[in-house]
Amino acid sequence: LGLLYRRGQGVDQDYSEAAKWYRLAAEQGNAFAQNNLGLLYAGGQGVIQNHQEAARWYRLAAEQGYALAQNNLGVMYVRGKGVTQEFQEAVKWYRLAAGQENADAQYNLGLLYRRGQGVTQDYQETARLYRLAAMQGKVLAQNNLGLLYEDGQGVTQDYQEAAKWYRQAVEQGYAFAQNNLGLLYRRGKGVAQDYQEAARLYRLAAEQENANAQYNLGLLYRRGQGVDQDYLEAAKWYRLAAEQGNAFAQNNLGLLYAGGQGVIQNHQEAAKWYRMAVEQGNALAQYNLGLLSFNSKDVTQDHEEAARLYRLAAEQGLASAQYALGWMYANGQGVEQDHVRAHMWFNLAADKGNSNAQKWRVSISRGMTPAQIAQSQQMARECEERNYNNCD
């Protein structure tokens, strides 16, 4: 009767009545009712929300071996709701439910193995558990198993297998899988390269407000891949993703404003979007905002700020920023002139194929002694070993 009141089947939906009847059954030891009463307390439906009370009812059902309650109690331990956060206790309850072939618990236990929470990190065990849940149709497990195959974690890297699992999740309308399968089609990994199919999949996910898919669809519109080139559409999709905090979209929307593509050219607006991405550590945005700061395009010219931004991007290995920082040192712009440091940054960028850096390395070396060049080359090697950090 409680179930009918909760679902509104044969009676008007009434969570208070559902709670009343669940409680009567739960107090007689009915595990199904105990779990469902716990759900009402967790969601604040028909009762005042109370996570401790939810955990108490879940535990009573879980101790009777009820798999759904065991999984729900595990979730409470992971989140620290109604109980003290304790991953090992979560593992215990997930494992009991997973042993009863509960797909949610199999997936949740797999997550803990992937993160190394409450257990030793083990991608192979993650893959095994995801597979069990995925074969039962658990969409999150299907997508995440695809990710493991794409990245080669816990399984041999296999793009075709990744595509297979993404596709199963796509068939259930899962936006993350739609985006992930779209990426494989765009890159031609595990499937024949097909920009139109990539665009179709991105659009499905983008219309579900998936920020990564919105960005990726914008990218296709900007490049004219799988769709007619359309900067207005690119700007539209970049903006939707950027407003959700996608740093790549924020940077690319800034580029459109800087170039007046699909929007009215506005360097201040470009700087605004670059700055949002910079705050998230996006190297391309750091470089692009540095360019605006250096060139004074409707923003305050500040060579020191440009050098600071170039350095942030250079320390992330961005060749164009390494070249730009080298140029600043070579010309004493925003930093004290230093040909040894300039040569070092030119070296690093040139080794990545940056043609401007290659030319400047040759040019600046003409005014340097062999000892200075040797010092610069040693600094460049040490900088690479430190992953470009603290190179000055």
Q: Model-predicted segments: where are they?
A:
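Short helix-capping/linker turns of helical repeat alpha-solenoids
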Residues: 7-9, 14, 22, 27-30, ...
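Terminal, low-structured helical/coil segments at or just beyond the last alpha-helical repeat
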Residues: 356-392
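Hydrophobic face of amphipathic alpha-helices that form TPR/SEL1-like repeat modules
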Residues: 3-7, 36-43, 72-79, 108-115, ...
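N-terminal segments that cap or nucleate solenoid repeat domains
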Residues: 1-4, 392
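TPR/TPR-like alpha-solenoid signature
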Residues: 20, 35, 71, 107, ...
